[in-house]
C-alpha cells in the first residue's frame, strides 16, 4: 500500500495532501504590514511552482536586534497570508535554526528568495538539493517605506 491517497479530483495525492507530481516552492518573510510588494513577491514565487509554502518569521528581532519587531500580531499576519490566493501552506518559525529545520523536513524542490541574496550565504543555501530562484524587486514598495508614510516621515 502506498502513502498516496486520491483526492476528490482523482489525482494521486502525497501524504501532504497535494498532487504527487507537483513542484513545491518555499519562501519566507515576516510579512509585517502586508503590502503590494509582498503580494508581487508572492505572485512571482507562486509562478515558479505548483504549490507554495510560506515560512512566516514570527519576530526577526529575536535573533537580530537591528531588525524591526513586527507591528502586526502573528494572528493578523496569518489571517492576511491565509487570504492570499498565491499561498498554499504556512509554517511559522522564530529562529534561523527553526527555518533550517523547516527547509530540511518539508518536501521542497525550489527555494524562492530575494535577489539581494544572490552570491551571499543565507539560511538553507548549503542545501544542494534545493533549486534557488531569486525574486526580482522592480518596484519601490517596502515595509520600511510604509512605516515612514504611516509616521509622516519623508520617504
Which residue ranges define each predicted feature?
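Nucleotidyltransferase catalytic core that binds NTPs
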Residues: 1-155
Amino acid at each position: 500500500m502506498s502513502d498516496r491517497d486520491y483526492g476528490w479530483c482523482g489525482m494521486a495525492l502525497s501524504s501532504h495532501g497535494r498532487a504527487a507530481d507537483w513542484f513545491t516552492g518555499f519562501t519566507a518573510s515576516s510579512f509585517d504590514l502586508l503590502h503590494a510588494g509582498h503580494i508581487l513577491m508572492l505572485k512571482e514565487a507562486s509562478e515558479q511552482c505548483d504549490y507554495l509554502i510560506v515560512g512566516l518569521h514570527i519576530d526577526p528581532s529575536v535573533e537580530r536586534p537591528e531588525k524591526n519587531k513586527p507591528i502586526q500580531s502573528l494572528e493578523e499576519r496569518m489571517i492576511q497570508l491565509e487570504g492570499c490566493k498565491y499561498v498554499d501552506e504556512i509554517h511559522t518559525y522564530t529562529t534561523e535554526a527553526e527555518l533550517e529545520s523547516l527547509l530540511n523536513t518539508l518536501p521542497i524542490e525550489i527555494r524562492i528568495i530575494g535577489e539581494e541574496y544572490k552570491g551571499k550565504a543565507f539560511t538553507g543555501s548549503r542545501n544542494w538539493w534545493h533549486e534557488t530562484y531569486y525574486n526580482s524587486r522592480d518596484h519601490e514598495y517596502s515595509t520600511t517605506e510604509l512605516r515612514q508614510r504611516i509616521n509622516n516621515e519623508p520617504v
